[in-house]
Amino acid sequence: MELETSVYRPNAAVYDSPDGVEVRGRYDQVFAKILTREALGFVAELQRDVSLGMLRYAWSAVERQNVVTTFVLSLGLTLPLSSSEIGEWVCSVCSPPAVADRRVEITGPVERKMIINALNSGAKVFMADFEDALSPSWENLMKGQVNLKDAVDGTITFHDKARNKVYKLNDQVAKLFVRPRGWHLPEAHILIDGEPAIGCLVDFGLYFFHNYSKFRQTQGSGYGPFFYLPKMEHSREAKIWNSVFERAEKMAGIERGSIRATVLIETLPAVFQMNEILYELRDHSVGLNCGRWDYIFSYVKTFQAHPDRLLPDRVLVGMGQHFMRSYSDLLIRTCHKRGVHAWEGMAAQIAIRDDPKANDMALDLVKKDKLRQVRAGHDGTWAAHPGLIPICMDAFGHMGKNPNQIKSMKRDDASAITEEDLLQIPRGVRTLDGLRLNTRVGIQYLAAWLTGSGSVPLYNLTDEDAATAEISRVQNWQWIRYGVELKRRTGLEVRVSKELFGRVVEEEMERIEKEVGKERSLREECIRKLARCLQSSVTAAELDDFLTLAVYDHIVAHYPINVSRL
């Protein structure tokens, strides 16, 4: 697949970088204020320290998949770090007062207008996302760093020329958390000692270096910065993050425990290691969050070779399913036992401005979901759109004057949850419509991701990001592999095959071209290339670990190697 890239000009300026660091992304004077010699040196030191530790746990995707599946299915869940499970220890008792109340959080990519609107939204927290909601192109990542620095400085503005409107921050804004990429994604535009930088350390390191001092003054009340950590599979990863935090605190000369982080529990292995993860991060933790969409993706990926564990249509895999409810309840109990917040994730429905009936349906779904969450004992929730914040805030108003439910909802009843509860096979039908929806979402999301957008409003009134696109991909792959019988609208069944899927792809491409081809400036040939890319992934003999990793090279735009110094 060929995508348009920037043209290199021989007389272009280059970044000033320290020994061992090469910056191969496009030069920009504004970016250069972020990519200073000192900031790049800081990132390089973090990577050199971390690389030594990560080498001990390095394993191929195939090896990891085999170990994870065996680990989960064996139910041999006794772990070596026994002190993390037993005893009455709690995470740091000096919890930052700035984040005692996090009942509603809004999430979104690190785009300039989004940052302003989210900070002004009335939510308690804004999670600025370098991960699933962002396509990690060089331009997006560097503009995101610039935007966050301006936000922390309080100087961020945005001029919407079409509306002739200037956006700026209110006096009262949400607390800022930043989510870096997962460990699996590299940053190919920066080389450290000849190897691609680790994406999450670039995101974390540049943001921390430029903002820790100002953030602690204006946002953190002496603490911070604050982070969300995604895609963890094992407490070893939490231990590595803890060492990164301690190294950063030491280099900055701030107190140990200043940095605080919430971990997303969004993989099947991690749900069995929540105590261990909190224990490793006990001086830096402020809670765990149910990353429900990635969790479903992880369930399918973990059991990819087990035809007895096929999921129904993804729209049917909600928190009402026993294995999902068990996961959420156990997370609440674990967090409250250890003195930190528990969240359940996204209300992905978005406001529908031009369809009052559809809008009412979406808002009703959100209201019911949020009331269920607060009654279960969660301390807060996520919203994908500012229009949903009043509904979420009203639901969590049931907590009364208390900023959280850590002491009032211990959920000791969840101690009875077993491994079988967490692995119970979900119920529901598998349909041809489900296969079609997965295919449409996959093609359209991939098109958006490769052209710079990471979060896209698509079908079912939802905001799709990488997590839901990944569910669609792996579910189609599994259904094809095992020739699953799918129900048609007529009630008859049809067996999935590569040939059937090929016909579905062609039909859904035609539908997409009619619906959004011209509107979103997606050329017909571009759509067809993307569809072929997805079709190849879904029908491959082996399942790719992450679709975004498999297609990452298509958004990399390298410039000549001699860009390391002025």
From Swiss-Prot:
Active site: R179 (proton acceptor), D465 (proton donor)
This enzyme's EC code(s): 2.3.3.9
Enzyme class: transferase
A GO molecular-function descriptor: malate synthase activity
Catalytic activity: glyoxylate + acetyl-CoA + H2O = (S)-malate + CoA + H(+)
Pathway in which the depicted protein is active: Carbohydrate metabolism; glyoxylate cycle; (S)-malate from isocitrate: step 2/2
GO cellular component: glyoxysome
One of the GO biological process terms: tricarboxylic acid cycle
Keywords: Glyoxylate bypass, Glyoxysome, Peroxisome, Transferase, Tricarboxylic acid cycle
Name of the protein this chain belongs to: Malate synthase, glyoxysomal
